[in-house]
């Protein structure tokens, strides 16, 4: 258990380092950090937390920074995230608060 926690901490460190490196302009080094974190995740059988998993492109491993390497668009209740490097797209359905929706129906 202790080993998996160490691996998870290292994965998080690498992804944060990649994000900061990409912000400073070195996308190649940032990609390498993300690839290394992904490899640690696979080899150590540790899942990357969702918050960090959404910080990079699944196709080219580039950290997604709004306006620099990522474009965000809203269509109705759908958020579309597009990587500006490889044009990979991910769609998220945004739902409102279910409790308030039920109260409005009554």
Curated annotation (Swiss-Prot):
It comes from the Archaea. GO terms for biological process: tRNA 5'-leader removal. Its EC number is 3.1.26.5. Keywords: Cytoplasm, Endonuclease, Hydrolase, Metal-binding, Nuclease, tRNA processing, Zinc. Pfam families: Rpr2. It catalyses: Endonucleolytic cleavage of RNA, removing 5'-extranucleotides from tRNA precursor. The keyword Nuclease applies. GO terms for cellular component: cytoplasm; ribonuclease P complex. Zn(2+) binds at residues 57, 60, 83, 86. Binds 1 zinc ion per subunit. It is found in: Cytoplasm. One of its GO terms (molecular function) is ribonuclease P activity. The keyword Metal-binding applies. Its main location: cytoplasm. It is an enzyme of class 3 (hydrolase). Its cofactor is Zn(2+). InterPro entries: RNP4 (IPR016432), Rpr2/Snm1/Rpp21 (IPR007175). Belongs to the eukaryotic/archaeal RNase P protein component 4 family. Part of ribonuclease P, a protein complex that generates mature tRNA molecules by cleaving their 5'-ends. Consists of a catalytic RNA component and at least 4-5 protein subunits. This is Ribonuclease P protein component 4. It comes from Saccharolobus solfataricus (strain ATCC 35092 / DSM 1617 / JCM 11322 / P2) (Sulfolobus solfataricus).
């Amino acid at each position: 258990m202790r080993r998996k926690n160490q691996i998870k901490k290292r994965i998080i460190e690498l992804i944060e380092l990649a994000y900061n490196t990409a912000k400073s302009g070195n996308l190649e080094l940032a990609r390498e950090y993300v690839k290394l974190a992904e490899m640690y995740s696979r080899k150590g059988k540790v899942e990357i937390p969702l918050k960090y998993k959404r910080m990079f492109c699944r196709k080219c491993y580039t950290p997604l920074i709004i306006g620099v390497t990522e474009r965000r668009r809203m269509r109705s209740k759908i958020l579309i995230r597009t990587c500006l490097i490889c044009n990979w797209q991910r769609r998220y359905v945004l739902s409102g608060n279910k409790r308030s929706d039920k109260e409005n129906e009554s």
